[in-house]
Amino acid sequence: MAFTVTPLCRNDEHVFNPFFFQVSSSNSTKLNHRFIADIYHGLVSPTDSYAGRFKFPVRPDGYGIFSPARVLESFVQSNITPSADQFVGSLTPQRAYSIKWGEEYDNSATLTGSTGVTIYSAITTNPTFGYVLNSAHPYENNFALSATVEYNVISATPILLTDWSYLTPKKIRRAEWETIACFRVLSNTIKIQTFDSGSTQVGEFLLQNGYNSGTIRYNLGIGTNNLDFSHNNELTSSTEPILPANVHSYLITMEFNGAERSAGYTYEIDDSCLLYETTRIAWLNQFGSHDFFTFKLIKRESINRKNTEWEQYLPYNYSIGDRGRTNLGVEVKKKISVTTDWLTDAEATFLDKCAQSQEHWLIDSNGNALPLILVDTTPDVGQSILTDRIFNRTFNFEYAFSQNTQRT
């Protein structure tokens, strides 16, 4: 018997985009033929859990086509850790899987004699193996996850799991939390290079805390608050704060045995004075990781309430203070509206991803992530004699939980 499985996909795939396997068999012309796929999954080992058996028919071209994506997507979930300290293993946004293949068909050439008898070929002992990420690629950007043990690869440039382009420096203020994620790590070091306002390098720090060679996905703590500690400065061979007051920018790369293993991401520290208290928002990006942005203009908070009431008629001898209507309970929802400062083109493109995301969080000063629901977003466009590209943007959120109140 000839039984062949041909992957029409890569070893690592986006779970929210269908990816396919083509199956063929010399038995495919037999009566009531069905191909069989047994799916197994786990955080690291794909044999941890059995997801189920799935049967699919032969197509007119003689092949069977099967995608495990819809099955596997129910096992991945987001994992936000804003206050991550260096390497923090984060496995739930990815899943290892394996598929064992087989087939079934009626042994009889006709529906007589052995009607209902089914022949199962042996499930193959050399299963398909791969990983999926809690990610999706848009139609206009059909990038692939790397088929090697590295990071995402676009134009052969290893990148980290963020929608912010490494080609553009990103602004960040002091005392802000931020993480960036990596997948299939070969690097065991986060390299931080710091620079003063004149672009002179003043520090180089190699961070390895939390790294484990058996972990394939990490959240990396790279915000100014995450890096608010002292470490050995490779330039001076002394223990110093990573981001002292004279640091204007810092460059983050992944490194292994002295060799850089990722593109470099530059963060420019914004120490400007502001009129309003800032609001830090995070969201689930297309890589199944999280991106962060600071809204610098006015923040408005409001409350919506819904009453559940009971009404009674007052007796003729009622007393002052007796109620005719009683509020049995109140459902309270808090809303928050935040507005950006004037945006660059890179920031505007970045926030388009925020507007498209289905999960958002408010990051407080302690690194807690409070879940939000994005209601809508409105661009506020300003006009100028020189340009019409001066604009900011307002995002309207609801907290994704009701406030606890007393009940009568």
Identify what each model region corresponds to:
Residues 2-3, 8-17, 26, 200-211, ...:
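Extracellular/virion structural assembly segments
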